[in-house]
Each structure stands twice: as C-alpha cells, then as structure tokens.
C-alpha cells in the first residue's frame, strides 16, 4: 500500500493548506488574523480577535485536517514511515499554505490531529500535558512548547515506531515558536485570557 503514499502526502499538504482561521474570520466578518492580534492565523489568535465560538471552529477544523489524511492512510495500510511523512505534510501545509501565500499558522492543532490516529492513549496524554501547562501558566504558546518537547518521549513509550516522524514534527513546531520562546524569556508573552480581562475592565456590568 506504500505505492499510494506519495499521493497521500500531496493530499495531506493540500488539506493542511486550507487555512480555517482566515476562512472563519472572513465568514464571521472578523479582521484578517494575519494582520490582526498576534498576526498568526491560528485558533489562539482568533480567540483574541473574535471570541470563543470562532476559535473553537478553527481549532476543530485544524485538528481534522491533520487527523483525516493520516487516519485514511492508516486504514489503507500505509507503513509507519509513510504515515509520519503524511503527518508532516499536513503540518507543512498549515504552516506554509499554498492557497494563502504560504503564510500560515504554527501547526500545533494540526500536529495534534495528525498524531491522534496513532494512539488514543497518546492523544489523551498529549492533550492533558497541553491543558495542564496552559492552566498553570496561562500561556498557550508554553503549552505547545512543552508538549512538543515531551511528545517524542510519549510516542517512544506508546508507539516507538513513530518516534522519528513525531520528533521531526516537534522540531518543526519548536522552530515556529521561536518568537514565542523569546517573548516568554523576556516575560513579554501575552496570556491567553488577558484579552477577556481587559474587555471586562472596559465594559463592566
């Protein structure tokens, strides 16, 4: 079945290239996430500029566009090596989307979706790591960074045959969070709920 893998890689990249953040913002009459807020077309920035409903829609779509190509390839019997490349292709599409001038998001939700078909136990542990980090720190970016750093070890424990491609995904996500890492180091990063606190202060009941 590996003969179909190159085609699945292309499909995964094209799926990843559909920027849900940009499309949802257009449909909802919101500012372009590439030029508003943090400038990142992802769920966290849509949360800042458009609220919870739009952000949830973006998050679900971004997870699915990573999950569906990998899941489809898995069901077709594609080998772990090619599954890893398909997962990476979906994330590359999200980060550098051909349909939107190669300016995309950071790939966290899409990577999470791409890893999900590998193991639901792994998915739960990864989600718990991200959520716990965000709840303790308030930083969505830190949750992504910590999850990316720990992911290869989780995968090695649950599904060791996928350790290499997941490590590549982790490196890709960490590279995309270079600016966030610098802001966290300088204590200049914005917490995920800061926008809502400011709004309540401006519009008290």
Curated annotation (Swiss-Prot):
GO MF annotation, one: glycerol-3-phosphate O-acyltransferase activity
Organism expressing this protein natively: Shigella flexneri
Pathway per the UniProt entry: Lipid metabolism; phospholipid metabolism
Reaction equation(s) it catalyzes: sn-glycerol 3-phosphate + an acyl-CoA = a 1-acyl-sn-glycero-3-phosphate + CoA; a fatty acyl-[ACP] + sn-glycerol 3-phosphate = a 1-acyl-sn-glycero-3-phosphate + holo-[ACP]
InterPro entries in the cross-refs: G3P_acylTferase_PlsY
Keywords linked to the UniProt accession: Cell inner membrane, Cell membrane, Lipid biosynthesis, Lipid metabolism, Membrane, Phospholipid biosynthesis, Phospholipid metabolism, Transferase, Transmembrane, Transmembrane helix
Main localisation: membrane
Residues spanning the membrane: 4-24, 53-73, 81-101, 112-132, 138-158
Protein name: Glycerol-3-phosphate acyltransferase
Cellular localization per UniProt: Cell inner membrane
Keyword Lipid metabolism: yes
Known partners and oligomeric status: Probably interacts with PlsX.
């Amino acid at each position: 079945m590996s003969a179909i893998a190159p085609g699945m890689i292309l499909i995964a990249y094209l799926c990843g290239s559909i920027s849900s953040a940009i499309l949802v913002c257009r449909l909802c009459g919101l500012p372009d996430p590439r030029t508003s807020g943090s400038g990142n077309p992802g769920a966290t920035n849509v949360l800042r500029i458009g609220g919870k409903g739009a952000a949830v829609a973006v998050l679900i779509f971004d997870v699915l566009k990573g999950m569906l190509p990998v899941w489809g390839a898995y069901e077709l019997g594609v080998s772990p090596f090619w599954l890893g490349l398909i997962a990476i292709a979906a994330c590359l599409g999200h980060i550098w989307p051909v349909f939107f001038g190669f300016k995309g998001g950071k790939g966290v939700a899409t990577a999470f979706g791409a890893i999900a078909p590998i193991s639901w136990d792994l998915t739960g542990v990864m989600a718990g790591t991200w959520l716990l980090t965000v709840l303790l720190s308030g930083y969505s970016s830190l949750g992504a960074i910590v999850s990316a750093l720990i992911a290869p070890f989780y995968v090695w424990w649950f599904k060791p045959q996928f350790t290499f491609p997941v490590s590549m995904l982790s490196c890709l996500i960490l590279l995309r969070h270079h600016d966030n890492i610098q802001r966290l180091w300088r204590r200049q990063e914005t917490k995920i709920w800061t926008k809502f606190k400011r709004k309540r202060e401006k519009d008290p009941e």
